[in-house]
Amino acid sequence: MNTKTCSIQMTSGSLWKNILMFSLPLMLTQVLEVLFNLSDVAIAGKFADYIALGAVGSTTLLVSLFTGFLIGMGSGVNVRAAHRLGAGDDNGVRLTVHSSLLVCSIIGVLACLICLLLAEPMLNLLKTKSELLPSAVTYLRIYSLGMPAMAVYNFGSGVLSACGETRRPLVYLSIAGALNVALNLFFVICCGMAADGVAIASVISQYLSAALIVIHLCRRKDCCALSPSRKYISRRACADVLMLGIPARIQNAVFAVANLFVQTGVNHFDAITVSGNSASANADAIIFNVQAAIHTACASFISRNRGAGNHSRMMKSYFVSLTYSFAAGAILGGLLIIFGRRFLSLFANDTAVIEAGMERLSIMGWSYAIASFMDCTIAAARGIGKTIVPTIVVIMGSCVFRVVWVYTIFAHFQTITSLYLLYSFSWAITATAEMVYFFTVSRKDRFAEEKSALEKSA
């Protein structure tokens, strides 16, 4: 297998260095995605009108739900490709690459069709304001046309990440994102368009990023190359990608539902508290995206080393990733506690709102580090091909538990602190259960690998 294209060695060298170098481009990619998504909202609000701003904003939940599934498929591709690469199975890699492209493309087309056909009913279900509904429906339908391209880009990003190549997807996303901002300005300012112009810009940029990554894969000379003239399709590979990718997205969807109950609790308080909660919640996306990059590295390194039969390095990859994730959560959370008022002043001018936001940050600031144990362990379990049980555990521990907390602990104390503390407790409980499960199955996995190796050598 040609490994020259693999920019970061996963099965040899310093794990401390390689995991960090693998994660940094992913962190930048995550931050860029947040910034480019914000550009849609900012340009719609600044240069169009409040209807355009509201229309784009009212589709956020649905867009996040559907794009989340597409991103999840990319993570499934990443884990399976990394495992086959680690095992030195060139044909298995080819089957994974081509089967994954088929699966991701189908999922992307299905997501597009659902949004095209059900955009208005779904937005009505979310109680979208009548004055915003026509523009919101138009935006969602146009935006959905880019979902097949988004699925293909995430497929390609998953393949390249499995190779240890995380810089190239960052470059492609940067190019497409810059075009997105430029087209947003062109369609809205020069053409006088509103939400529809913003959606068209997004679709064009998504197809550009997909085209760039597909062209690169077609030009590769190794087993990760796309060969349109050959048929490398495997039902097993298709099933594996689905089993690895879908549970994580179901988990995120249930998280969103559980957080609606938390928001209901917040809404029991005055407008200042609600505004402070909203302002401080902006920190979540930043810190979780940084940690998510490390968790992707964790799954990739574990899967790659598992394929290579290197159990000790596999476990060390977990502990190194966990250390980085914990450090990121602790350091960034600590900075938020220290400089929280300055951070909140970016979103609010009212002193009372800032102080209300600090109530949340003072608890969440040290809770992000706790979350690292949960999320990193889930990623590690995914790296060894285990997704169903971790998903059930996180649904029970971090979702069902939150709903129960709201109707028991919070209902008893009726304080905002008692509500915010549910994050810390739910993450701690879930992390404990996930770690017990991971260490149990990883031990069994090691014994199974050793037995298989002995049988082959006999």
Which ranges hold each PLM region?
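Transmembrane alpha-helix boundary and packing residues in multipass membrane permease domains
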Residues: 26, 30, 42, 79, ...
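Short alpha-helical transmembrane segments in multi-pass integral membrane proteins
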Residues: 1-23, 81-148, 190-246, 302-367, ...
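Transmembrane helical elements of multi-pass membrane transporters/channels
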Residues: 21-40, 142, 153, 176, ...
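Short runs within selected transmembrane alpha-helices of multi-pass transporters and secretion channels
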Residues: 74, 143-161, 169-180, 198-213, ...
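Helix-terminus/linker motif at the lipid-water interface of multi-pass membrane proteins
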Residues: 35-54, 123-130, 186-193, 249, ...
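Interfacial/gating helices of multi-pass transporter permease domains
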Residues: 44-64, 131-135, 195-196, 237-244, ...
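Small-residue-rich hydrophobic transmembrane alpha-helices
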Residues: 53-113, 150-169, 263, 276-334, ...
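N-terminal transmembrane alpha-helices
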Residues: 10-47, 61-76, 80, 105-112, ...
